[in-house]
């Protein structure tokens, strides 16, 4: 993995992917997945309208210059084409030693291993660059694909919280159960 850090942006690459800072031109590409009901069915947000996506991108631009920075949410792009296919975030906790991993991939690219590849890179980034002791992740209990990603990453299953999140699913809200995973830097 190649980590490249400059004053303007943070980038790291995996074998097939480039993770970069979001920019103002990313609204349409983000809307392609964030505005899709199937793509966001297991998320605790969405589907988002265009204004919500614009606000999301603007918030990510603002976070790029915050000090100290606690949110590292990157655009996941196919290295060969530059096409933005999702997002991968590392959200640092207040203690500076623990973080949460989160991700979304455009459904047109599901089943190709991109989420696992980007998440593996983000875990390394969190442990190596930010010296995190523990990185956790969670997913809707019905999201078997995300569950498999966390298992492939070697994350340890820590339990399932029953009816723990009240989320918007399609046009209505409902209680959903959540699976929790974590990985220690020493693992």
Where are these regions (language model features)?
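Conserved GNAT-fold acetyl-CoA-binding loop/helix
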Residues: 38-61, 74
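Acyl-donor (CoA/ACP) binding surface of acyl/acetyltransferases
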Residues: 1-38, 58, 75-187
